[in-house]
């Protein structure tokens, strides 16, 4: 990621293969815990490799960065096709590195892809993997897509017992997963 960015270029097919295997930090909270002696090398390596902002975001993402298995994604696309969807504006509101874009069936390739990812590392990887997609690296609550713009929204929204601040939806007191569903439907 950093090599491509420092050289201001797209990722090669080999680099894309490597980058597409990134699955976030959801399964590695111990790597961010300095009190875990068995993880001390990984802890230090992360501190050395990541900027302060990247490190803080990666540590925070251990709470909800869980990626969707390809078989689930394929099944979701099969349902869409069975319902008659062929092309249109597709939103992935919490995209990680874009696994849903990577498994987009051939029959849906005429669609325009839009993605949103809060985590900087995941979002930057997604931009390298899918340069033709419109990807925003920010919280979903900070996007300003017009209502009724998307034909389909697909993905695996974050789940948790915490809320997102968005004036348009604050009155509903949604937990994060409910918020994502409500905003996506609008």
Functional labels for PLM-detected ranges:
Residues 1-186:
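Class I S-adenosyl-L-methionine-dependent methyltransferase catalytic core
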């Amino acid at each position: 990621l950093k090599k491509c960015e420092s050289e201001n270029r797209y990722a090669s097919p080999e680099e894309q293969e490597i980058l597409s295997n990134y699955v976030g930090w959801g399964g590695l909270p111990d790597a961010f815990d300095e009190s875990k002696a068995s993880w001390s090398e990984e802890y230090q390596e992360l501190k050395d490799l990541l900027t302060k902002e990247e490190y803080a975001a990666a540590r925070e993402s251990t709470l909800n960065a869980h990626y969707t298995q390809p078989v689930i994604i394929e099944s979701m696309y099969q349902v869409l096709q069975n319902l008659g969807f062929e092309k249109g504006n597709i939103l992935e509101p919490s995209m990680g590195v874009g696994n849903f874009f990577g498994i987009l069936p051939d029959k849906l390739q005429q669609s325009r892809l839009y993605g949103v990812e809060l985590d900087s590392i995941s979002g930057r990887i997604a931009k390298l993997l899918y340069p033709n997609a419109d990807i925003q690296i920010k919280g979903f609550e900070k996007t300003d897509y017009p209502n009724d713009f998307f034909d389909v929204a697909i993905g695996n929204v974050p789940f948790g017992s915490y809320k997102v601040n968005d004036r348009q939806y604050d009155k509903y007191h949604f937990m994060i997963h409910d918020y994502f569903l409500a905003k996506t439907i609008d």
